């Protein structure tokens, strides 16, 4: 499932609908809001760019008691500091855009497929 629709092309930019056509070929991000929003009115929660999360990835990473991404077989929970990435990107597969899918990388890595989301608390609830 993707955020806002089960049809990936309705809500996400990924390799199947971004210029380039094959993973690794030249393509680009898209302006926010060109696809459907999700149920909360948020855009681009799936696809466009991978979003960095604050969670550290470990090979023991589990969701609901079940391992959801086996990861690399590195030794020691914090041998390498890897952060969780979610959402998929314009250069990745439709599977990577699923809400439940996670990826990870070292925290000082950057490329054209990743980004972050700014979040601000409205004055009315402070």
Question: Which functions belong to the PLM regions below?
Answer:
Residues 4-7, 27-28, 45-126:
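Surface-exposed recognition segments
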Residues 10-42:
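A short, contiguous structural element within a folded domain that forms the immediate neighborhood
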